[in-house]
Regions:
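Catalytic phosphate/metal-binding cores of nucleic-acid and nucleotide-processing enzymes, i.e., regions
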Residues: 1-113
Length: 113
């Protein structure tokens, strides 16, 4: 029986990651050090029961845990200030794609980048 590699992860009450059966992963973060609406917040998300933000940043990783270029920004690997709808669109792309170049190409077409 093939071992499943899909999993969820959490990060300091300010984000999560998802690794999909295809081996690709996405990190979604909305904390004080991330490119999001709460970037300059003085509160520590770990001390609060709930932590919300109107925007988030994402990064996508390949099967070797290396960052994939997903935008035209300066570093190209982290994309910030994204709405929930845009994050959901990227999750669909990452979870349903078989090759890295397809993720790179499709993510560049999203309007919020």
């Amino acid at each position: 029986m093939k071992e499943k590699i899909s999993q969820f992860g959490t990060n300091r009450n300010k984000g999560f990651s998802m690794t999909f059966e295809n081996g690709f992963a996405i990190s979604v973060q909305w904390g004080t050090e991330n490119y999001c609406a709460r970037r300059f917040e003085k509160k520590d998300p770990r001390e609060l029961r709930f932590w919300r933000s109107s925007t988030a940043e994402i990064a996508v990783l390949n099967k070797k845990d290396e960052f994939i270029k997903i935008n035209n920004g300066s570093d190209g690997v982290v994309s910030g200030w994204l709405s929930t709808d845009t994050v959901a669109e990227v999750i669909v792309i990452v979870s349903s794609t078989k090759i890295q170049k397809e993720i790179e190409k499709k993510s560049l077409t999203l309007s919020s980048y």
